[in-house]
C-alpha cells in the first residue's frame, strides 16, 4: 500500500493566512525552523497509478500539482484520482471537491450523515450535478468493510468517531454515528494495515483494538495542550470541545500512543498553534524521544 501525505496541517494550514501567533509570525520572519503545511488530506493506492483521495482539502490544486503521479498524462484530460473518500463533512475536508469539478463525474464514498450534510447545509452534491454528472454517491456502512474497484487490493473498514457535525449542519447539536469516521485500511496482498483518524477525540477499548491491529497509526496531532488556543490568545475553545485529543497531559495522545510500541506512529492534522511545528522546540524533542513522527506535506509511507 502506498500512502501519500498531500496535506498535514489542520484547518487554515501553516502558516495560517490571517494568524500572527508565535509560530506563524516566526515562520514568516525566518526565526522559526519549520515547514509550511497545507490542509489535511492523504492519498492511498495499491499500484502507485490509481489513487483514492481521502478528504478533499481547500488546497487540493497545489497538493495535486506537488505529487506527480496525480497527473499520469495518459490523455488530454487525465488524473490519478480514481475515487474519493470523505471522512466527515467539514469545510476543510470537502471544499476541494469544487476545485475538482472539471474532472466530474467522481466516485465519492461517504456515510449517510455526511451525504445528508453535503446535500442540505452545504449542498455540494446538488451544486456539482451541473458538471458532467457531478458526484456519484457510494454509501459507507458503519458495519463491515468495502472495496473500491480502482484499488481492489485495499480493504477499507470504517469506524465511527465521537465528534460534532460541522457548524453549518442541520444537526450540529444532535450528533449521529457517521458524522465523523476513521479508517482501517488493509493491503490484502502484503497484509499491511493503516489506522487513519485525523480527528480523534477519545480512544476507547474498541478503537485501541483496531490500533493494535495496524502497522501504522496516522492520528490526530491537532494540539499539544487542550487549552492551546487560549494560551496562544487566538481562541476560546479547547481541543476536546472541537473533538481533538491533545498530545500533552494525562490521558493525552502521547500517553495513548505509549500503549502501541510496535506500531509506526505519525501525527497529522497539526494546528498552526502547535509547538511541535517548531523543529527546535522541546515539544518536538519529546516526540523524537517517544519515537513519534510528525507528518509533512509530501511524506510517503509504504505498507
UniProtKB/Swiss-Prot annotation:
Family classification: Belongs to the PqqB family.
Function, as annotated: May be involved in the transport of PQQ or its precursor to the periplasm.
SS bonds (residue pairs): none
Listed Gene3D superfamilies: Ribonuclease Z/Hydroxyacylglutathione hydrolase-like
SUPFAM superfamilies for this protein: Metallo-hydrolase/oxidoreductase (SSF56281)
InterPro entries: Metallo-B-lactamas, PQQ_synth_PqqB, RibonucZ/Hydroxyglut_hydro
Source organism (scientific name): Pseudomonas savastanoi pv. phaseolicola (strain 1448A / Race 6) (Pseudomonas syringae pv. phaseolicola (strain 1448A / Race 6))
Pathway: Cofactor biosynthesis; pyrroloquinoline quinone biosynthesis
Alphabetic keyword roster: PQQ biosynthesis, Transport
Keyword DNA-binding: no
Any Pfam family hit: Lactamase_B_2
UniProt keyword Ion transport, yes or no: no
Example GO biological process: pyrroloquinoline quinone biosynthetic process
Protein name listed in UniProt: Coenzyme PQQ synthesis protein B
Amino acid at each position: 500500500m502506498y500512502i501519500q501525505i498531500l496535506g498535514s496541517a489542520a484547518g487554515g494550514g501553516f502558516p495560517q493566512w490571517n494568524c500572527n501567533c508565535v509560530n506563524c509570525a516566526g515562520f514568516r520572519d525566518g526565526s522559526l525552523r519549520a515547514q509550511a503545511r497545507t490542509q489535511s488530506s492523504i492519498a492511498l493506492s495499491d499500484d502507485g497509478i490509481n489513487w483514492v483521495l481521502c478528504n478533499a482539502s481547500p488546497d487540493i490544486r497545489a497538493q495535486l500539482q506537488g505529487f506527480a503521479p496525480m497527473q499520469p498524462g495518459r490523455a488530454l484530460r487525465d488524473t490519478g484520482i480514481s475515487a474519493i473518500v470523505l471522512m466527515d463533512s467539514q469545510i476543510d475536508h470537502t471544499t476541494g471537491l469544487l476545485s475538482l469539478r472539471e474532472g466530474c463525474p467522481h466516485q465519492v464514498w461517504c456515510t449517510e450523515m455526511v451525504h445528508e450534510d453535503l446535500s442540505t447545509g452545504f449542498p455540494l452534491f446538488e451544486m456539482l450535478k451541473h458538471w458532467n454528472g457531478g458526484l456519484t454517491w457510494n454509501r459507507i456502512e458503519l458495519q463491515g468493510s468495502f472495496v473500491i474497484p480502482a484499488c481492489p487490493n485495499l480493504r477499507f473498514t470504517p469506524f465511527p468517531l465521537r465528534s460534532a457535525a460541522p457548524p453549518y449542519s442541520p444537526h450540529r447539536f444532535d450528533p449521529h454515528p457517521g458524522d465523523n469516521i476513521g479508517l482501517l485500511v488493509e493491503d490484502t496482498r502484503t497484509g499491511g494495515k493503516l489506522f487513519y483518524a485525523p480527528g480523534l477525540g477519545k480512544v476507547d477499548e474498541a478503537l485501541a483494538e483496531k490500533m493494535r491491529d495496524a502497522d501504522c497509526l496516522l492520528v490526530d496531532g491537532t494540539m499539544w495542550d487542550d487549552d492551546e488556543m487560549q494560551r496562544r490568545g487566538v481562541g476560546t475553545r479547547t481541543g476536546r470541545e472541537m473533538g481533538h485529543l491533545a498530545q500533552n497531559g494525562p490521558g493525552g495522545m502521547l500517553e495513548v500512543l505509549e500503549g502501541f510500541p510496535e506500531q509506526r506512529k505519525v501525527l497529522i492534522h497539526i494546528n498552526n498553534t502547535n509547538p511541535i511545528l517548531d523543529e527546535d522546540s522541546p515539544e518536538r524533542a519529546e516526540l523524537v524521544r517517544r519515537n513519534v513522527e510528525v507528518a509533512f506535506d509530501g511524506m510517503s509511507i509504504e505498507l
